[in-house]
Design a protein with these regions (language model features):
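Short N-terminal binding/cap micro-motifs at the start of the first secondary-structure element
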Residues: 12-17, 45
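Short gly/ser/thr-rich secondary-structure transition/capping motifs
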Residues: 47-55
Length: 187
């Protein structure tokens, strides 16, 4: 089974993975295992009040996982998230594996230099000027979700487009199946 790891922080946005996780668990793709990781094993509570206990700590993420998906959270990506997440995200990117970041997680990815050589999108590109680690304003595209190779970003209003682009990056299913899934939730 190919593992896709979702990183959750406190006050995570429960809707931002609500389309991708089931798509990977058989709605669109076969052969994927979805797992949730965080800095510790304590329960995380979503913006909507959903309580989830991570299955893994960041240090337990398997080296052979196929993708790392960073889910937005109300304020948590702005409150000094663990350095281990940046290490993992760069390692996944450097080894050609898929990295997805949505909403404030995409902003954070830009702040740690993860988006400096790829086209990407964000909630608000203007606030990126505050981050010396971000040097790719010209790579910003005003779109719901952007895929550049194995890096996928999305603004917080685009969980369906984000799911479709992560599925494409993983080559998890034929394009027709991915597009039909996305269309079902957007048309």
């Amino acid at each position: 089974m190919k593992q896709v790891i979702f990183v959750l922080l406190d006050r995570y946005a429960d809707w931002e993975f609500a389309y991708l996780a089931p798509a990977l668990r058989g709605e669109v793709a076969q052969g994927y295992q979805v797992r949730f990781a965080s800095s510790d094993m304590l329960a995380k509570i979503s913006i909507g009040g959903l309580t989830m206990r991570p299955q893994l700590t960041l240090d337990e993420i398997p080296e052979d996982a196929h993708a790392l998906v960073l889910i937005g959270a109300a304020g948590s990506w702005r409150e000094d998230p663990p350095e281990r997440i940046a290490q993992l995200a760069h390692a996944f990117k450097d080894s050609g594996r898929v990295v997805g970041a949505i909403c404030d997680a995409a902003r954070w990815a830009g702040s740690v230099g993860l988006l400096n050589d790829v086209r990407h999108t964000l909630n608000d590109p203007h606030e990126m000027a505050d981050f010396p680690g971000y040097t790719n304003a010209q790579g910003y595209l005003p779109e719901e979700s952007v895929r550049d190779g194995n890096i996928v970003t999305a603004n917080g209003n685009a969980p369906v487009a984000f799911a479709a682009n992560v599925l494409r990056a993983l080559e998890a299913a034929p394009e027709k199946a991915i597009q039909e899934y996305a269309d079902f939730y957007t048309i």
